[in-house]
UniProtKB/Swiss-Prot annotation:
Binds three molecules of c-di-AMP, each in a pocket located between two subunits. c-di-AMP binding is accompanied by conformational changes of both the fold and the position of the B-loop. It comes from the Bacteria. It is found in: Cytoplasm. It holds the Pfam family CdAMP_rec. The keyword Isomerase does not apply. Gene3D superfamilies: 3.30.70.120. Its main location: cytoplasm. PANTHER family: CYCLIC DI-AMP RECEPTOR A. This is Cyclic di-AMP receptor A. Disruption phenotype: Not essential. 3',3'-c-di-AMP binds at T21, F25, T28, G35, F36, L37, N41, G47, E92, G94. Binds cyclic di-AMP (c-di-AMP) and is probably involved in c-di-AMP-mediated signaling pathways. In vitro, can also bind cyclic GMP-AMP (3'3'-cGAMP), with lower affinity, but not c-di-GMP or 2'3'-cGAMP.
Length: 109
């Protein structure tokens, strides 16, 4: 058995949740915040049998879309400084960050 931890953008989370549950995966959905963009993410915890890991990964890949987003960099002095005028920077966001972890034991009470 494996535990898949998948971090996706909030924009992709409802579609992914529906797809996973439609394919009979049990999913726990957590609201999280990314450290780089300081924006909302959704983290899914999915317990799966070893033979279903590849199917779960393909569904996550199909439903996590990469997109470009403009962000204003944070002041190098920490916080907003009046003399620092940041220029927006385009970064690629989205997709999914996925961890597949072994599960030694699983209990359901």
């Amino acid at each position: 058995m494996k535990l898949i931890v998948a971090v996706v953008q909030d924009q992709d989370s409802n579609r992914l949740l529906k797809t996973l549950t439609d394919h009979n995966f049990r999913v726990t959905k957590l609201a999280t915040t990314g450290g780089f963009l300081k924006s909302g993410n959704t983290t899914f915890m999915i317990g799966v049998e070893d033979i279903r890991v590849n199917k779960a990964l393909s569904l996550i890949k199909e439903n996590g879309q990469k997109r470009d987003q403009m962000i204003a960099p944070v002041s190098p002095m920490g916080g907003n400084a009046d003399s620092y005028v940041p220029y927006p920077v385009e970064v690629e966001v989205g997709g999914a960050t996925v961890f597949v972890l072994p599960v030694d034991e699983f209990h359901q009470f």
